[in-house]
Curated annotation (Swiss-Prot):
The name this protein goes by in its record: Monothiol glutaredoxin-S9
InterPro entries cross-referenced by the UniProt entry: GlrX-like_pln_2, Glutaredoxin, Thioredoxin-like_sf
GO cellular component, one term: cytoplasm
Keyword Ubl conjugation: no
Domain Glutaredoxin: 1-101
GO function terms (MF aspect): 2 iron, 2 sulfur cluster binding; metal ion binding
Chain residues that bind [2Fe-2S] cluster: C21
Function: May only reduce GSH-thiol disulfides, but not protein disulfides.
Keywords: 2Fe-2S, Cytoplasm, Iron, Iron-sulfur, Metal-binding, Redox-active center
Similarity annotation: Belongs to the glutaredoxin family. CC-type subfamily.
Gene3D superfamilies attached to this UniProt entry: Glutaredoxin (3.40.30.10)
Length: 102
C-alpha cells in the first residue's frame, strides 16, 4: 500500500488506470479539457498489478480503475469525478493543478 500512497502523491492529479479501460481514457480527456495534465499509472503494465489493485480497494476505491487522486486525496472513480464535474465542484478542486495556458 505504501507504493500506491507514494504514487498517488507524486503530482497534483493522479489516475490509476489500465491501458484497455475506456472509462480511464474518458476521465483523462476530461482532465485535459480542464487544463490539467494528470499523471497516469497504467497498472496493467506494472509487475505488481494485483497488489496495486488490492491496495486501491483498501484505500476505498469501489473499483480498482480508474482511481483518481487530487492533491494526494482519493476522489474516487469515474462516477465520483463526473458527479463533481456536473455539480461544478471539480474545477475549483483541480484549479491549483491547471497548466498555465497563457
Amino acid at each position: 500500500m505504501d507504493k500506491v500512497v507514494r504514487m498517488s502523491s507524486e503530482k497534483g492529479v493522479v489516475i490509476f488506470s489500465k491501458s484497455s479501460c475506456c472509462m480511464s481514457y474518458a476521465v483523462q480527456v476530461l482532465f485535459q479539457d480542464l487544463g490539467v495534465h494528470p499523471t497516469v499509472h497504467e497498472i496493467d503494465k506494472d509487475p505488481e498489478c494485483r497488489e496495486i489493485e488490492k491496495a486501491l480497494m483498501r484505500l476505498g476505491c469501489s473499483t480498482p480503475v480508474p482511481a483518481i487522486f487530487v492533491g494526494g486525496k482519493l476522489i474516487g472513480s469515474t462516477n465520483e469525478v463526473m458527479s463533481l464535474h456536473l455539480s461544478g465542484s471539480l474545477v475549483p478542486l483541480v484549479k491549483p493543478f491547471q497548466a498555465n495556458l497563457c
